[in-house]
Amino acid sequence: MTPQQSAQRLFQEKFNCTPTLNVYAPGRVNIIGEHTDYNDGFVMPCAINYGTAISGRKRDDSRFKVYAGDLQQWDEFDLAQEITPDSSKKWTGYVRGVVKFVQTHCPDFKCGADLVISGNVPLSAGLSSSASLEVAVGKFCQQLGNLPLTNTEIALIGQKAENQFVGCQCGNMDQLISALGQKDHLLMIDCRSLETIPTPIPANVAVMIVNSHVKHDLVAGEYNTRRQQCEVAAKFFGVKALRDVSLAQFKQREAELTALDPEVAKRARHVVTENQRVLDAVKALQSGNLALLGELMAQSHESMRDDFEITVPQIDYLVELAQIAIGKTGGARMTGGGFGGCIVAVAPVEKVEAVRQIIADNYAQQTGLKEDFYVCTASQGVSVC
């Protein structure tokens, strides 16, 4: 059963009536460009065929009554009163936060709703289950109140909710790709100007995701620490964000920054080189050069492992296994915020079984964890269904 079918069925079951509004927002996988979004840099994700559906209908009052189908939990809050976090149920922060900032953006939005949420994005896997939920809630509110919000604005409201209400200082990539994704395309996003360049995925190329089942929780601190270190580096270079530092400028002052703070220097090196890799990856894809894309993905993973220090041994092992099977016909790297989660692999379709097999034969035996393997389709962004 799809999330859309599940949400509609559950709504009928919980509220004894038919939903009048159904929305769906996808999760995402990032092919290259990690921890660059909050540095005003470049990223290249695609929306995937896993996401979050919301079914609901307008109420006569200002209350929101929400049922999370996958967690079998309820939440209730009132738009006529101040919306505050409920620390006992983490998921409610994403819903309440978005509704709160929709209200900030559109003060006349006061209509309540009954709604059911259902999703199939693996949780804490680095595939943006939270952004998918935020964008779905934003789109639901926009449709419910007939609000003058673009999909880009909905994405930025989702980011604001995660930053200021949930407490994770994420960038804007996850919400933007969930809102703006294009079927069969990767989307290069300039996270400062919000300009996007759609790049078609060649028909014979597969995007694979492997979930390590090492759980990460970005609110726990490491993510926010990395962001602070990047801000320190930007200040050192006298710029607004590390996006404004070229590779040549970085190399010119690298020794000086390393002497001051070797850890901050490593973080900056990752961001500066990763931005360039994204730009190079767009050209590689446009020319169908999968070997070059694979090299760039390998460099990205090494940089995340050695300079940004956000990988874990299980993730490094998955990347190593996938790369053995893929050879020079594509690439693999960790994807997402880090400290667990998933790897992404891009390779010709005929390599999929070899990648699946080498991981099935070795990963659990070596780590004691069982992976999940997905072949993904690049999908359309948020929609009313």
Swiss-Prot record:
Gene3D superfamilies: 3.30.230.10, GHMP kinase, C-terminal domain. Pfam families: GalKase_gal_bdg (PF10509), GHMP_kinases_C (PF08544), GHMP_kinases_N (PF00288). Its EC number is 2.7.1.6. Coiled coil: none annotated. PROSITE patterns: GALACTOKINASE, GHMP_KINASES_ATP. Pathway: Carbohydrate metabolism; galactose metabolism. GO terms for cellular component: cytosol. The active site is at residue 174. It catalyses: alpha-D-galactose + ATP = alpha-D-galactose 1-phosphate + ADP + H(+). Its main location: cytoplasm. One of its GO terms (biological process) is galactose metabolic process. Mg(2+) binds at residues 130, 162. It is found in: Cytoplasm. ATP binds at residues 124-130. Keywords: ATP-binding, Carbohydrate metabolism, Cytoplasm, Galactose metabolism, Kinase, Magnesium, Metal-binding, Nucleotide-binding, Transferase. Substrate binds at residues 34-37, 223. It is an enzyme of class 2 (transferase). Signal peptide: none annotated. The record marks 28 as: Transition state stabilizer. GO terms for molecular function: ATP binding; galactokinase activity; magnesium ion binding. It comes from the Bacteria. Catalyzes the transfer of the gamma-phosphate of ATP to D-galactose to form alpha-D-galactose-1-phosphate (Gal-1-P). Belongs to the GHMP kinase family. GalK subfamily. This is Galactokinase.
